């Protein structure tokens, strides 16, 4: 499942907040503040829109507590990485893991330079 730059920044921030306090209900404002801490300034409404998109992709789950909505991860970072790796392998190597591994081995010197 493809994710854009802002979606990935939101997810990484979300997972970071979750790892610090597993019992915390995570709000949109928590994510807005977390992003601001790493220099990403976006409007509350922008973050809400992207988080709702992540809900529609079944990556986050939204629930209501009192009058506020909160979010939790439907996928942890490891599950998401595996899902993206499978998608990458399917899209670029026809699902052939051996081809993908050979590609990475052949390009590893270029990858290490960056």
How does the language model describe each region?
Residues 58:
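Glycine-centered, phosphate/nucleic-acid-interacting loop/turn motifs that mediate DNA/RNA or nucleotide
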Residues 1-22:
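Short alpha-helical segments that sit at the start of domains
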Residues 62:
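Short beta-strand "wing" residues that participate in macromolecule-binding interfaces
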């Amino acid at each position: 499942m493809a994710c854009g730059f802002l979606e990935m920044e939101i997810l990484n921030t979300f997972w970071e907040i979750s790892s610090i306090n597993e019992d915390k209900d995570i709000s949109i404002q928590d994510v807005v503040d977390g992003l601001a801490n790493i220099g990403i300034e976006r409007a509350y409404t922008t973050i809400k829109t992207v988080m709702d998109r992540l809900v529609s992709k079944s990556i986050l789950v939204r629930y209501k507590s009192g009058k506020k909505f909160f979010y939790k991860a439907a996928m942890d970072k490891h599950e998401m990485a595996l899902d993206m790796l499978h998608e990458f392998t399917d899209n670029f190597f026809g699902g052939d893991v051996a081809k993908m591994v050979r590609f990475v081995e052949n390009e590893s010197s270029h990858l290490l330079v960056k």
